[in-house]
Amino acid sequence: MPRKLISVLSVAVVMSAVAFGAHAADKLNYDAKSFAAAQAAGKPILVEIHATWCPTCKAQEPILSDLEKQDKFKNLTVFRVDFDSQKDAVKAFGARVQSMLITFKGSVETGRSVGDTNPSSIAALLDKTT
């Protein structure tokens, strides 16, 4: 009997985590068509110019992940541009280096930063999308 109760409670905990995770920002691999659609819909957008080998990008990941879970950023759409394989997109955004964060409110660019790993200033950048 206790074993069955533990199983039921475990399932309930997992289901709660899934339900609460739905409030996190949408994170997508960049493609021009989806980005244009998000802009046309007036969505708050973050573009990450990212490289898997970049230590600054790795330092930004947990900061962004925590911020994206906040209720005020639940409608944020995050597009990750691969610095090494998506050179056309990198060029289109005017990015010369990885670890660049660019924010938009619909089609209007609201800010950008390069190499920032300060949670407060990254939060301030994301605030410009709301």
Task: Locate each region found by the language model.
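Typically the conserved alpha-helix immediately C-terminal to a functionally engaged Cys/Sec
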Residues: K58-K72
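Short active-site neighborhood of thiol/selenol oxidoreductases, capturing the structured segment around
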Residues: A40-T52
